[in-house]
Amino acid sequence: FNKGQQEVVLNNFYDDEKPIAITLNPSLTPSQNAQKYFSKYQKLTTAVNHVNEQIRQTHAENEYLETIETQIQLSDPQDLEEIKDELSESGYLKRKQSLKNKKKKVSKPHRFRSTDGTSILVGKNNLQNDQLTLKTAKKTDTWLHAKNIPGSHVIIENNNPSEETILEAANIAAYYSKFQNSANVPVDYVAVKQIRKPNGAKPGFVIYEGQK
């Protein structure tokens, strides 16, 4: 096409029977018209990417706050204090400067014993979850979590637990989750060495692979 044209009709790669008519600026050369549309495409692509990133961040934020809500429902007074500390550190809650600067030790997770005597540990808040999974547990221990919903990190202190212990730990993971009152709560379990925490992730958030 040439300078001065107001429109050009091009083939439609998605439908041969419906060619596309593109409006042109007759004062611009073909190259300038093409550059104009390319610049517009780049701006739209950038805008779409920005919106998608905002959606991703909002989704992650909602998941995090759902986790906090679940933990509050299951918490005791000590857990509530740690949840307050976490929310303060994350910028969701304002606390007095003296309390903010005071370094607190993360409380210990709950400990259970399975029928065969195996130790099972449960984090009751995100600070406990991080401490338990990333620092306390051995790489060979077994980690459990309710599948795709907010819940506690559960650790079986054994690299080859019995099926009975896995089932009992799974029941604990289901109880300490958003769906604790549901009759059927799927639970993932995997070796701790398969767990990792992404850079910049919020407390309690981890990713894993190879789950059963």
Where are these predicted regions, by residue range?
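Extended, highly charged segments
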Residues: 1-212
